[in-house]
Amino acid sequence: MSDSITNIFVISDSVGETGLSLITAGTVQFPNSKFNIRRFPLTKTISLLQGILNKAKRENAIILHTFVNPELSDYVNNFGKENNLHVIDALTGVVQTLAEITGEKPLNAAGLKHKLNPDYFKRIEALEFAVTYDDGKDPSGFLKADIVLLGVSRTSKTPLSLYLANQGYKVANLPLVPKTQIPKEIYQVDKKRIFGLTNDPEVLNNIRRQRMISYGLDPDTVYSNMDNINQELEFATNLYKELGCLQINVATKSIEETATLIIESLDSED
């Protein structure tokens, strides 16, 4: 694990949502690393692209792009080679392969996915919802959410919320801390929409120690203390039992696996 922050530029001649979703799915696999992701949408000219690439060079950023314009795509790829930058061309290979197999010439028109996909605006709304109601910022969100996630610190509440939001679900989450008052709204939510996240004490201890080290702090703190962690988990488990909600141990599960369990649970109740 590195203490440094990895800069990532997501560049697109459309809104950049495809690239952002892809890089988010990748970065959540590295919970002990720090990433600074910036999106540069509607980049449709070489002159505009040059300024962004020069900034990426100064910051030694990873570049992920989803250009459908071959000229812009080639420009970024060549810039990366010339300046020893890591460039991820997320779309060209897909389009070229489909063109070869179908024998059809691609339109090379930006944003067609969003124009043709009726779920696009639903997902954008869900992503905005997840950001607004992350970390228990506004308890009213629990009553509006499709899914409510509960969990102690470092149980992947936020990345899981964003992943589910990208599937179109409105998600609100609440961090659980012993001796703090649980918002009354939680008790008003249908238990079938609440999911209690937990983790193994040893896993939490390791994650929290590494987090302290990444900040240049002493890893042996109250935050990473095993007795404290066990108290937190006991507090969470008792609450889950009181609410009658589904409990999910995320210790050995990826974000995608946990999300699948949640979605399957929701679908089984419909």
Curated annotation (Swiss-Prot):
Catalytic activity, EC: 2.7.11.32, 2.7.4.27
Family listed: Belongs to the pyruvate, phosphate/water dikinase regulatory protein family. PDRP subfamily.
General function of this protein: Bifunctional serine/threonine kinase and phosphorylase involved in the regulation of the pyruvate, phosphate dikinase (PPDK) by catalyzing its phosphorylation/dephosphorylation.
Annotated residues for binding of ADP: 151-158
Reaction(s) the record says it catalyses: N(tele)-phospho-L-histidyl/L-threonyl-[pyruvate, phosphate dikinase] + ADP = N(tele)-phospho-L-histidyl/O-phospho-L-threonyl-[pyruvate, phosphate dikinase] + AMP + H(+); N(tele)-phospho-L-histidyl/O-phospho-L-threonyl-[pyruvate, phosphate dikinase] + phosphate + H(+) = N(tele)-phospho-L-histidyl/L-threonyl-[pyruvate, phosphate dikinase] + diphosphate
InterPro entries: Kinase-pyrophosphorylase (IPR005177), PPDK_reg (IPR026565)
Domain of life, source organism: Bacteria
Single annotated GO MF: ATP binding
Keywords: Kinase, Nucleotide-binding, Serine/threonine-protein kinase, Transferase
Name of a matching Pfam family: Kinase-PPPase
Name of protein: Putative pyruvate, phosphate dikinase regulatory protein
